[in-house]
From Swiss-Prot:
Record key words, sorted: Coiled coil, Cytoplasm, Golgi apparatus
Name of the protein described by the UniProt record: RAB6-interacting golgin
Coiled coil: 145-304
Entry GO CC: cytoplasm; cytosol; Golgi apparatus; nucleolus; nucleoplasm
Region: Necessary for interaction with RCHY1, residue numbers: 188-368
Domain of life: Eukaryota
Protein's cellular compartments: Cytoplasm; Golgi apparatus
Disulfide bond positions: none
Subunit structure: Interacts with RCHY1, RAB6A/RAB6 and SCYL1.
Ranges of compositional bias, category Pro residues: 77-86
């Protein structure tokens, strides 16, 4: 029971499916031919021998013939004595790797299906072909396959050569680009280095100047600190001296005031002892005493002014003024009208000389 093509059995179809090349899916391995195919090939060979081709194509198998002999063979009509034998075109299409589908289409035609039983009877009558022809045919098929493989290999080699050339060209172009980029980068790096050198030189000069300025600033700061310390000490010393001066002036004023009080008391005691009755003389004495007191107060005020100014530190002027003032009251005292008054007046200048030691000690105190 043949389900597909009548020329193959189910076992042969399974074998064909199992023997497919995984690396070459488009090509099929050579398959054992049936008796019908062998008979057709044998008839084709006989026909070619009868025709007697002059170009030597009769010695070759139909698969190895070029297009021109195939066209000639297809153009020639089959002899009327063999109606069961198909034309060479159908035989050539039924053989080879990619010719199985053509044979199947021819066998499935309605005319061939009707003559199927007649071909079987012819197969029984015809003898088996020689094994040598089949071997030659297989060798030729292998050679043709080898040539195809060689051609494919050559094509692949050419493609690889082209790819290598393109790759080398791309590499050369890329290398040129990289060289140009490296040159640009080197130039930019040199420019940056030059800028860095200029900036570093300027920075070095500025740093040296900054160091020098910082040293000068430190020296000036030290001098300022010393001057400030001296100023503070001088100010404190000035304050102490002013305090001592004020204390001395106050002491001088108190001494002068006490001296004047003592003088007044002494004069009163002398007047009581003498019991002066004359009113005129008493009035004159009182006037003289008041005048002396006023002069002493004015002198004390004049002495306070130069002490505060500190323009005349020595006390020679003060002592001279005190001596002059002490001499001035002696003039009216030297001309008394009576002996009592002369005694009193003679004793008064002696009492007026009492503040002289205090006045003499004043310049020494101020100098200290």
């Amino acid at each position: 029971m043949a389900q597909g093509w009548a020329g193959f059995s189910e076992e042969e179809l399974r074998r064909l499916k199992q023997n497919k090349d995984p690396f070459e899916p488009q090509r099929r391995l050579p398959v054992k031919k049936t008796r019908q195919q062998l008979q057709r090939e044998k008839a084709l060979l006989e026909q070619s021998q009868k025709l007697g081709l002059q170009d030597g194509s009769a010695s070759l198998l139909p698969e190895q013939l070029l297009s021109t002999p195939k066209q000639r063979a297809s153009s020639q009509k089959p002899p009327p004595s063999s109606p069961a034998v198909p034309s060479p075109l159908t035989l050539t299409s039924s053989t080879g790797d990619g010719e199985l589908h053509g044979g199947e289409s021819q066998l499935q035609e309605p005319g061939l299906e009707n003559s199927h039983h007649g071909s079987r009877s012819a197969e029984i009558q015809t003898p088996k072909p020689d094994c040598k022809v089949e071997k030659k045919k297989m060798e030729l098929q292998e050679k043709s396959r080898w040539e195809v493989l060689q051609q494919e290999q050559r094509l692949m080699e050419e493609k690889n050569k082209r790819k290598k050339a393109l790759l080398a060209q791309a590499i050369a172009e890329r290398s040129r680009r990289t060289q140009a980029e490296t040159m640009k980068l080197k130039r930019i790096q040199k420019e940056l280095q030059a800028l860095d050198d200029m900036v570093s030189a300027d920075i070095g000069i500025l740093r040296n100047r900054i160091d020098q300025a910082s040293l000068e600033y430190s020296y000036a700061r030290k001098r300022f600190d010393r001057a400030e310390a001296e100023y503070v000490t001088a100010k404190l010393d000035l304050q102490r001296k002013t305090e001592t001066k004020e204390q001395l002036t106050e002491h001088l004023c108190t001494i002068i005031q006490q001296n004047e009080l003592r003088k007044a008391q002494k004069l009163e005691e002398l007047m009581r002892q003498l019991d002066v009755q004359a009113d005129d003389e008493a009035l004159e004495l009182e006037l003289e005493v008041e005048q002396l007191l006023r002069e002493q107060e004015a002198e004390a005020a004049r002495q306070m002014a130069p002490v505060e100014r500190l323009s005349q530190p020595d006390g020679e002027g003060v002592s001279s003024e005190l001596t002059e003032e002490n001499k001035e009251p002696q003039k009216p005292a030297t001309s008394p009208e009576t002996d009592k008054s002369g005694k009193c007046c003679s004793s008064s200048p002696r009492r007026l000389d009492c503040p002289d030691p205090g006045a003499q000690n004043f310049p020494a105190a101020v100098a200290t």
